[in-house]
């Protein structure tokens, strides 16, 4: 039995252009009545679907009845007609704030109009417009408003906006919401770009701002003191930033602030900062820290704005320091034996005072640190009654350590704090080697004559040895379990020895047991003292079992802590070592570098390089060997500083000789002036070499055949290998 299938094609009724568009016109008219608040009910779903379907069907009809292009043109015509016949007349009959309110209303209505018309014509926009590469219906709609409405209104709107902003600057209340909404019209007409906003409004705002604050600066600078002027300037900057927050576009802020800063601060900077009665020097003189902080805040964001303030700061500190030197010199002339000691105390007080200024008023800015240093270098290197600053400082330290502050009888902590402050001053002394020599001699005198405070440095060693003997006896009598390692502790008294860096090192178990045992023992001797462990001074002898032989390694406590980790793991990452030992990155890099990158490579580092990074891994180098069975694995010092232990002049001659030879060995051939300059630079950290002395040392090195003059140019020297 055969089955017959019938295919039925339903043909839609053809919609002519005018017929279909008449339906659309009805919908457009309804939409416009809604926008004009003419009590028109909203679209119901059926009406919306009907309008959408009309456009859809007219776009799908076969040519020549495909009316896509015609509908696209009519869409443009509808929007243009509405803007010309309805929007523009309503705008033209209003002025001032009323015009702005109408502009905001019409812009909001226009966005609604475009959104609804685009929804009705969605199929047209989605396919026909996209295929032809035409401007979207949204773009067509907004271009119409821009060309027909915005272009005619924007200039007047700009003038009204600027007038409102001027009123607010003068203290009047304005409708900020209205201003913000109008600004949104400028931004919205850029269609995602800020060019229109910047050219049509922002540029005029910036010009107006500059003119306004130029007038204010001229009047205020004549009427107000520097502190009062700065208060007003700070308030103006705050209010301008609030304006950006309240109604301007965020991109305007840096430009607006720059204009205000330029007119209120940059243009009048010299007049303001150098004001004789209330400027920077007057604020420093009167200790007006709040005003100085404000001056710093105002000028810190201006390029080179802080330089004149910092220069005056240096000038003021230098003047105060020179006054102290003069007072001390006058007192010394009057046979006041304590003049130099009083000078150091006052210099310390001066340094403490202005360090507070640098930290609090100037937020630790490097420029103020630099110029404070330069100021102190000026007067801290002057002589008083024939005594150099190096000798005066050394004598002050000697008196503190001998008499513990004289009549004040300083505590251990106060003594240490005072000495730290002296060290702060020592940074500014050019002849540090001279200070070291004076200090060494005075220290020897204290020890020889059994003066109180410093003798602790000697007696501590004796007491520490006795304490160690008692500890050994204690272990023999009380410990049922042996510690497993020989453990020696040297106990020193805080306050009479140099301070050392302490860390919260996580000790290996082997060491922890020893430390805890000593703590228990020490608790039986005293319960009023606290032990602070200085691991950086410790030394460990550990056995390394390598493939070829077992070797004794002499290492620091830190190095030992690292190596002992590899008893429990064949391979460890940098992060694992760091977490287990609880060491800083700087300390751990130094340790791992000493064990894997220098002469004795106890550890193998991957990847192989001369630097340590946080991604490196390490493993025990079982193949390591050396001809010696006992080796000392050096740990590079944190800071190497040349110490002068003999006569200063002789030491300087040796230092200059060494510097000259080192420079010439590196450079081979060098002109006289360049050699002298490099030598001065090379030695300036410890002292300022005398130019005449350098010339004499060059001649001496020539006589000893280290250097020779160039045969063609007597002012050029050659290194003799």
UniProtKB/Swiss-Prot annotation:
Q: Which residues form the Cullin neddylation domain?
A: 651-713
GO MF terms on file? ubiquitin protein ligase binding
- Gene3D superfamilies from the xrefs? Cullin Repeats, Cullin, Chain C, Domain 2, Winged helix-like DNA-binding domain superfamily/Winged helix DNA-binding domain
Q: What is one Gene Ontology biological process annotated in the Swiss-Prot or TrEMBL record?
A: ubiquitin-dependent protein catabolic process
> Which SMART domains does the annotation name?
CULLIN, Cullin_Nedd8
Pfam families with a match to the protein in the record: Cullin, Cullin_Nedd8
Protein family (similarity comment): Belongs to the cullin family.
Kindly provide the name given to this protein in its UniProt entry.
Putative cullin-like protein 1
């Amino acid at each position: 039995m055969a089955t017959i299938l019938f295919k039925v094609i339903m043909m839609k009724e053809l919609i002519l252009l005018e017929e279909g568009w008449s339906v659309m016109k009805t919908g457009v008219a309804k939409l416009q009545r809604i926008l004009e608040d003419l009590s028109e009910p909203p679209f119901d779903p059926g009406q919306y679907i009907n309008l959408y379907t009309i456009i859809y069907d007219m776009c799908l009809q076969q040519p020549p009845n495909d009316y896509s292009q015609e509908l696209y043109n009519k869409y443009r015509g509808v929007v243009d007609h509405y803007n010309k016949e309805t929007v523009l007349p309503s705008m033209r009959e209003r002025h001032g704030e009323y015009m702005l309110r109408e502009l905001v209303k019409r812009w909001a209505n226009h966005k609604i109009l475009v959104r609804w018309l685009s929804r009705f014509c969605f199929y047209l926009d989605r396919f026909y417009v996209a295929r032809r590469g035409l401007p979207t219906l949204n773009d067509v709609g907004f271009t119409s408003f821009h060309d027909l409405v915005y272009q005619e209104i924007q200039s007047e709107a700009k003038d009204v906006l600027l007038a409102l902003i001027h009123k607010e600057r003068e203290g009047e209340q304005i409708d900020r919401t209205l201003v913000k909404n109008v600004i949104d019209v400028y931004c919205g007409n850029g269609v995602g770009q800020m060019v229109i906003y910047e050219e049509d409004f922002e540029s005029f705002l910036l010009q107006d701002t500059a003119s306004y604050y130029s007038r204010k600066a001229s009047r205020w600078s004549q009427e107000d003191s520097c502190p009062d002027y700065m208060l007003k300037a700070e308030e103006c900057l705050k209010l301008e930033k609030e304006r950006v927050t309240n109604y301007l576009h965020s991109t305007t802020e840096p430009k607006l602030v720059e204009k205000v800063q330029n007119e209120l601060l940059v243009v009048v900077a010299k007049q303001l900062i150098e004001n004789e009665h209330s400027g920077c020097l007057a604020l420093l003189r009167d200790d007006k820290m709040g005003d100085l902080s404000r001056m710093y805040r105002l000028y810190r964001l201006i390029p080179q704005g802080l330089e004149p303030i910092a220069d005056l700061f240096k000038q003021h500190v230098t003047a105060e320091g020179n006054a102290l030197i003069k007072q001390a010199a006058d007192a010394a002339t009057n046979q006041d034996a304590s003049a130099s000691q009083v000078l150091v105390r006052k210099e310390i007080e001066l340094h403490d005072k202005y360090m507070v200024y640098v930290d609090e008023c100037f937020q630790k800015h490097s420029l103020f640190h630099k110029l404070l240093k330069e100021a102190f270098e000026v007067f801290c290197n002057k002589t008083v009654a024939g005594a150099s600053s190096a000798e005066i400082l050394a004598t002050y330290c000697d008196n503190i350590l001998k008499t513990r502050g004289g009549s004040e009888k300083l505590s251990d902590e106060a003594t240490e704090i005072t000495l730290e402050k002296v060290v702060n001053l020592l940074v500014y002394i050019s002849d540090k080697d001279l200070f070291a020599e004076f200090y060494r001699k005075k220290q020897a005198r204290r020890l020889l004559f059994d003066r109180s405070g410093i003798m602790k440095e000697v007696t501590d060693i004796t007491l520490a040895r006795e304490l160690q003997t008692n500890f050994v006896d204690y272990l023999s009598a009380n410990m049922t379990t042996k510690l497993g390692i020989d453990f020696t502790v040297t106990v020193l008294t805080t306050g009479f020895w140099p301070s050392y860096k302490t860390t919260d090192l996580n000790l290996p178990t082997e060491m922890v047991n020893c430390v805890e045992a000593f703590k228990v023992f020490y608790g039986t001797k005293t319960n009023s003292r606290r032990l602070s462990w200085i691991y950086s001074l410790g030394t460990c002898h550990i056995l390394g079992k390598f493939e070829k032989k077992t070797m004794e390694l002499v290492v620091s406590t830190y190095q030992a802590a690292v190596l002992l980790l590899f008893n429990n793991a064949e391979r460890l990452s940098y992060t694992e070592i760091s977490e287990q030992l609880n060491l800083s990155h700087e300390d751990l890099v130094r340790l791992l570098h000493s064990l894997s990158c220098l002469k004795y490579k106890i550890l193998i580092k991957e990847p192989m390089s001369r630097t340590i990074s946080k991604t490196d891994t390490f493993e025990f180098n079982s193949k390591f060997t050396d001809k010696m069975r006992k080796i000392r694995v050096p740990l590079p010092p944190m800071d190497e500083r040349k110490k002068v232990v003999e006569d200063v002049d002789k030491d300087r001659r040796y230092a200059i000789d060494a510097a000259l030879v080192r420079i010439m060995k590196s450079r081979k051939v060098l002109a006289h002036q360049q050699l002298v300059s490099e030598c001065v630079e090379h030695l300036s950290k410890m002292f300022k070499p005398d130019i005449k002395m350098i010339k004499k040392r060059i001649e001496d090195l020539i006589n000893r055949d280290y250097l020779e003059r160039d045969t063609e140019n007597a002012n050029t020297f050659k290194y003799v290998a």
